[in-house]
Amino acid sequence: MPKLKTKSGAKKRFKITGTGKVMYAQAGKRHGMIKRTNKQIRNLRGTTTLFEGDAANVKKYFLPNQR
C-alpha cells in the first residue's frame, strides 16, 4: 500500500519541531489592525505551539508521514 499524501494546505500552515510539537502562525494580522493596540499587534508576531489535542489531529490526518 502506498504512502498517504500530505495535505498541501497543511504543509504550508504547520511545522513539526524536533520534539514533535506542531507550530503555526497566529491569525489576525492581515488587515483591520488600526482597531488594535500596539500590544495586541506585537503579541501576534511569530509562531505558537498548537494545543496537544489539535496537534494530534493535524499529525494524524493532514501530515501523516511527518510523525
UniProtKB/Swiss-Prot annotation:
Disulphide bonds in the chain: none
Annotated PROSITE patterns: RIBOSOMAL_L35 (PS00936)
Keyword Ribosomal protein applies: yes
Gene3D superfamilies for this protein: 4.10.410.60
Gene Ontology BP terms: translation
Domain of life: Bacteria
Descriptive protein name: Large ribosomal subunit protein bL35
Source organism per UniProt: Methylorubrum extorquens (strain PA1) (Methylobacterium extorquens)
Gene: rpmI
